[in-house]
């Protein structure tokens, strides 16, 4: 299950990067994007970037949700391992105490 969420998160992150880079530039440095407006007419014809912004919003939401899920799964794995380590340490300490008590008896 952890592997599924991890692969899906990687897919969402690459999709977000691709969609963000696909947007047409409207800022200060438009000289880089000379002919990109003609290449991506599908995204520009729907509206003033509304379609691609909605897709990016959905992918960003999925990214947030899946990263929280992965953090919770990873946290549960770490906490369960910590509890197992503490229990084994307690058992070894108790066994050592019992051995000391058994070995401390002197025959009369």
UniProtKB/Swiss-Prot annotation:
Ranges annotated as spanning the membrane: 2-22, 51-71
Record's GO cellular component terms: plasma membrane
Protein's UniProt keywords contain rRNA-binding: no
Location of the protein in the cell: Cell membrane
Membrane topology reported for the UniProt record: Multi-pass membrane protein
Database matches in Pfam families: SecG
Major place of residence: membrane
Example GO molecular function: protein-transporting ATPase activity
Protein's GO biological process: intracellular protein transmembrane transport; protein secretion; protein transport by the Sec complex
Keywords (A to Z) from UniProt: Cell membrane, Membrane, Protein transport, Translocation, Transmembrane, Transmembrane helix, Transport
Coiled coil: none
Subunit record text: Part of the prokaryotic protein translocation apparatus which comprise SecA, SecB, SecE, SecF, SecG and SecY.
Job of this protein: Involved in protein export. Participates in an early event of protein translocation.
PANTHER family in alphabetical order: PROTEIN-EXPORT MEMBRANE PROTEIN SECG
Matching NCBIfam families: secG (TIGR00810)
Family: Belongs to the SecG family.
Protein name in the entry: Protein-export membrane protein SecG
GN (gene name): secG
